[in-house]
């Protein structure tokens, strides 16, 4: 039987505010346990929450960016459940009237095509605390610094059909919230976490299968691995005559498996009711429109512009627009060199490899956009070859010079373009390889094509990579066939 996967994602984006959603406590990551939890966060008697207006602004800007309906009257509700790191016994969230209604987001698939993913809603809520197990020898410690941290929970429609599509969607959300400046997107610190709802059904069947929810997956790689494992688990279970039960599961990256945590709750299990301590939030049209004017050029808009303005492929445009910092870096390189394709190739190639190797974000790149643009200009005017350019790039990364020109001059790397000098070097190289020359001249066309590369390599070696490759090819062919 052929199976179809159905996936819906709930993404929790921690909003980049300095204080919590209902109190003035700080939200800084990494503070000593329980040093950023106020009486309000702890739910002490007599305390009352005060809504942080900046969280409302951030949520509305997100809603506008996904072309969603904005809830002009939205209500906070209490989500009731017991957990050790939830001191109040309830979480303040939104249920019936969220701040952001139906919207959508386009994602780029591996083949470059676009797919539209529906977004059911996005609502504001407070985070819970954190349970600590490692250092307490049979006990659990509770850190309430995170309690009350503002979250925007973004709920997708069940429009996703594979683990790769899920990753593409999460990456698109990740890029969007960073473009908007509402979340730093640091998944390692828990700023962006994902709950994956996964089910399978026979291909062609309309009704959904029973879903399992994988909680709190916090990396793109783990999202893909967790979903793929869960898909396989459910298919094998059904084909062996079993039934998938609705439950919450946890992904263990060390064992690459999901395991059951608890039965999956429904909304009525949480006994939602309007929070009596918070009035409904009423958003006027003018407030929403003023926020619309603050929206930057968004990732999909930038991708489309990169394709139309610079003639880039859909893939290149998607990679370069994935973060605002990379897009700005690329355009700064282009401003210097004027060649979009070369700029794109170097940013996505040598520069990205360097950043990955060093574990750096592009804003901390050791090679500035101006330096890279200057290097590309020296390739364009034939001052250096592409091979030498990589050596110069490495020198720039190692801070061996302020510019490509300075490094080229100091190391004597300027490309040899003098025809006489190249011919002299070729004559010496061919004389040193006389036997191979005779074999080449006696060979048929197919063998000659293979052997020609040997002579080019010897020529470039003899010139220490400085000879102009185009001239080498042209002159070498004349000499070998003359």
Swiss-Prot record:
Q: Any keyword Transmembrane helix? A: no
Broadest EC class? ligase
Q: Could you tell me the keywords of this UniProt record?
A: ATP-binding, Ligase, Nucleotide-binding, Protein biosynthesis
What's an example GO BP annotation here? Answer: translation
Highest taxon above the source species: Bacteria
Q: Which family does it belong to?
A: Belongs to the GatB/GatE family. GatB subfamily.
The UniProt function text for this chain reads: Allows the formation of correctly charged Asn-tRNA(Asn) or Gln-tRNA(Gln) through the transamidation of misacylated Asp-tRNA(Asn) or Glu-tRNA(Gln) in organisms which lack either or both of asparaginyl-tRNA or glutaminyl-tRNA synthetases. The reaction takes place in the presence of glutamine and ATP through an activated phospho-Asp-tRNA(Asn) or phospho-Glu-tRNA(Gln).
What is this protein identified as? Aspartyl/glutamyl-tRNA(Asn/Gln) amidotransferase subunit B
Gene source species:
Azotobacter vinelandii (strain DJ / ATCC BAA-1303)
As recorded in Swiss-Prot or TrEMBL, the protein's gene is named: gatB
